[in-house]
Each structure stands twice: as C-alpha cells, then as structure tokens.
Amino acid sequence: MGFSEWNLIWIDLEMTGLDPSRDRIIEIAVVVTDSNLDTLAEGPVLAIHQDRSLLDSMDEWNTRQHGRSGLTERVRASTVTEAEAEAQVLAFLKQYVPARTSPMCGNSICQDRRFLARWMPDLEAYFHYRHIDVSTLKELARRWSPEVAEGVRKSGNHLALDDIRDSIHELRHYRREFLRMPA
C-alpha cells in the first residue's frame, strides 16, 4: 500500500528539555503505517545540529540520557539544520500521506507538537489537528486494567526511531489486550 489518506504518521522528537520557548529539537524520526499499524516505511532519522552552549545547558537527566545513548555526540557532529530536517521529513511524508489527513501519532505527542509548532511549523501544519496518543491508553490501562499496562515492554533508550517502534508495538498491545480487537 502506498499513498493513502488512511495512512498514519508516527513521529518522535528528542529535545534538549521540555520548554519549546528555550529548548530545541536534537533528533527527529518518522514512520508511516497503514491503518492496521503495519509499517509501510521508516523515514529519515536525523540528528539536528545545535550549538555547544545549548547542549551544555541541558539539565542533568537530558545530559545523562543523550550522552549515554550517543545522541549528544551525533548532534555535535551533525550538519543538518532544523530547516533541512523539516524539508527532508516533509518530502518523505508527501510520498505516503496527503496533507492534513493523518493524526499525529506517538506517545505524549502533544509535547512533540508543541516543539514542531515552534521550530518546524510547516511540518506541524502537515498533520491533521487530531492525535493518536498512545499514552492515553497507557494511562487508562494503568487505572482500569493494570495487568494490561504491565504487559508493555519498551526499549527505554530515548532514541527517536526506537521510541516510535515502541509506540506502535504498545498500541498493538492495547488493541489486542485492552480494546480486545483482533490484529
């Protein structure tokens, strides 16, 4: 299956912190699935160059996490700007999904949308205004069916492509075990 308004765009960003007014995007990845959550294509996975002073100002959690994963060094070595990353991702998505048809899919996706609106507005505008936020099902399962929530295993390495794969896997799990729908 190729180009379709029913395809879903999954996105994840890694950032220097949680405040889009002062923090920046340092990694972006996208995956396109069909409506049954079968992967059609994995898009660009890009470390985005940011100034050393910004990287040096990250809080302890981000410094440790992105240092351990190797992302900080990838960002330092990268020559890709936010504008170039945005253009590459848009060019990829236009092969699979018409503009403003796919909800933004991922985990805690509102946070990613806030950063896209600030730093990559053309990409943010490519999405429909709705979301498929896997974290909603996670929170409901934790409250209503804890055994279902406990059945989810994630890589936890906080790299954008791995986080997307984890989110798709997690939604498949909730579809099967929580929503009780066949795959």
UniProtKB/Swiss-Prot annotation:
- Gene Ontology molecular-function annotations: 3'-5'-RNA exonuclease activity; nucleic acid binding
Which Pfam family, giving just one, matches this sequence? Answer: RNase_T
SUPFAM superfamilies, per the entry: Ribonuclease H-like
Keyword set for this entry? Cytoplasm, Exonuclease, Hydrolase, Nuclease
- Say which enzyme class the record assigns: hydrolase
Q: Which GO terms describe its biological process?
A: DNA metabolic process
Q: What EC designation does it have? A: 3.1.15.-
For this protein, the record's InterPro entries field holds: Exonuclease_RNaseT/DNA_pol3 (IPR013520), Oligoribonuclease (IPR022894), RNaseH-like_sf (IPR012337), RNaseH_sf (IPR036397)
Superkingdom to which the source organism belongs: Bacteria
What does the UniProt record say this protein does? Answer: 3'-to-5' exoribonuclease specific for small oligoribonucleotides.
Record-stated family: Belongs to the oligoribonuclease family.
Indicate what this protein is called per its UniProt record.
Answer: Oligoribonuclease
